Amino acid sequence: MLQRFITSLMLLPFPGSALAALQNQDAPQHMTCTVAQPTESMIGAVQLQKTEAGTIGVESRSAEILANEKAYFTGNVIIQRNGQWLSTSKATIDQQRGEILASDGITFNDGYLSVTGDSLSLDLNDDQAKLYNSDYRLQNHNARGHAELLSLSRQEVLLQDSSFTTCPGETPAWQLRAERIEINETSDFGEAWHARFELFDVPVLYLPYFNFPLSDARKTGLLYPTFDSSSNSGFEVEVPYYFNIAPNMDATIAPVYMSERGTMMKGEYRYLFEQNAGQFNLEYLGNDDTRIANKKRYLWHVQHSAQINQDLSFYLDATEISDDNYLNDFGSDFAGRADTHLYRVAQLDYDNENWTAQLRTEDYELIGDYRSPYRTLPQLSIDYNTGDFTGFSASLYNELTYFQNQDQTREYATRAHIEPSIQYRFEKPAFDTEAELSYLYTRYWQESPDANITEEVTRTLPRARVRARLHLERAIELGDSQYRQTLSPQIQYLYVPYENQQNIGIYDTSLLQDDYHGLFRSRRFSGLDRIAEANQITYGVSSSLFTQNEREVLRASIGQIYNINDSRTQLFASDEETTTSSNSEWVADINWAVDENWSIRSSIQYDTELNTTRKSQTAVEFRKDESNLIQVSHRTATNILNNDIEQVGTQAVWSANSRWQVASNVFYDLTHDRLNDAMVGIQYSSCCWALRVSAYRRINRDLEPAFSATQINGETQFDNGISIQFIISGLASDSSGLINMLEKSTYGYRRPFYLSN
């Protein structure tokens, strides 16, 4: 007959509560391993009841108590205290020594840690428990393993001659075997000494010391290593180490070994405060073995933003590289491989109800043999706006800029600009109209060896602009669906008189790209160094379809500029004398959400006089969800830096099931009949690990052939590479993915659809 014995022995809380704070961490790609929970057979077919604090409840088939000093229990022994229990065949409680001994197969469980082993000893005085030859499970965190000796204390679990894994099965996909593993409750992470990492029971890596997080919280420790192979750098391995400095501060250091180049060190420091945030990055390779000169390679990047007070803010963003080939050889999170320059800016902004002001310094680092741009050192702009008074408003824009060029043979300049304007706007539900009259005063002080550049220049130009637009709509039925159609025709007149400006240098001005909305701009050039002559009428129409729940499914626009007089203002004296004799190109674009999954976007600029397409771009996308999409695109452009471009491309990410995912992009140059860029990646995910393999092929842009020649007999060379990443659930964090791989490729993925949803 089952008997119940209650003893008044005092017992400190079981140390298994040290794992109470452990949280479950999701494995990659939506899958989580199942950890077996304790069953009724593990604790005996009895109903456990709570006991008073400080007492031990014992149930067994037989018991023997000697002089109130020792108690012997046998047969289905269950020892219970405050929801913690121990199940065994034999147990001894020695009150005089403050010790509990259990043997012949024990099971311990406190709701967080479940342990089965051969025997247990518990020191009540030191609150220490030892379990021998035991298997353990962290129930709220998908982790388990074996330990020859498992020691429990109030704050930690110590595993000796042990293993650790988050995978199920007798032969787990991965496991960590270590001489010693400590799992800490306070910091919620584990530490291992003299550890070896095994894949399918095969040792692949020895680690004298290793720490790893046990939850999704940020923890100091190793992140996932990445293995790559490329024709440029050879075999590569990157092992990042993360430092959780403070809740608002962290850092990462990552050595990158490249068999052909040497070892690069990467570092990142990030901070976040109530009113400012930023980061600093540094990459350094002291001796690039592939180069015959300029062997030191580096990149640094700094970014900082601060809200000084309600009206005043500061922003800084700057990147520098050691040489023109750096991005091509190593890539970067801060610039693309095909970029032609690095932009640097520091600015102080003031903004209140009527006044805005900005003090800014701007700089560019050119990548390749391009025309050297100007720094603005600095630029001060002040803008005042009166606000609306019965449709009328006035504004005053002021700017003072000093330009400095890196090329000492070219001009320096100071530019002052004052632009008062008066605007009138009249709005009704069915139409709106606006008129603007501006006076543009600009003064230059220039220093230049160019005889065509005048030392002091004053330019004064008026500008008049009138624009009117209708807003029409109707209900329309297409098939079985009801829609609301909008129709917005608009017309604009713009007048700016001609003034010869070839005696003014080009400091921050370029030709703006045209799209439908760009047709109705008041300027043809960015910056102030050229103000284009205009006596023109712009007309266009835009129409949209909205569903009954106000989802825009179609938007189409078409427009053109009609020049009453020829525009003679050009960027450079060597450009064609006039822009066009009458009409500019037709500009049209369309965005169409065919259904919930299919979308189409197309735009075109067509020259009716030359019967040629200046630019066009078309993209068709099928998007099942954020993890399943296919996009096909085609684009053309004529006379871009004296070159014509025609390119087709496809990008895709697709999940075949919960385990398999594939991503790829391919961009083909039809003009030169060559593959510009291609990448394919495959990922397999289980509940506790994932394997990501990718391969790429891209043009090798060698901008410094004197240091590292990659052009052979004038033929374009390509860089081919393979990347392998093994991702483990339960040891580190992973922020990468196949979507990220597409976004960081040479022609990164962009969603080209701009409908209002």
From Swiss-Prot:
Belongs to the LptD family. One of its GO terms (biological process) is lipopolysaccharide transport. PANTHER family: LPS-ASSEMBLY PROTEIN (PTHR30189), LPS-ASSEMBLY PROTEIN LPTD (PTHR30189:SF1). Component of the lipopolysaccharide transport and assembly complex. Interacts with LptE and LptA. GO terms for cellular component: cell outer membrane; transporter complex. This is LPS-assembly protein LptD. It is found in: Cell outer membrane. Its main location: membrane. Together with LptE, is involved in the assembly of lipopolysaccharide (LPS) at the surface of the outer membrane. The keyword RNA-binding does not apply. InterPro entries: LipoPS_assembly_LptD (IPR020889), LptD (IPR050218), LptD_C (IPR007543), OstA-like_N (IPR005653). It comes from the Bacteria. Keywords: Cell outer membrane, Membrane, Signal. The keyword Transmembrane helix does not apply. Coiled coil: none annotated. Residues 1-20 form the signal peptide.
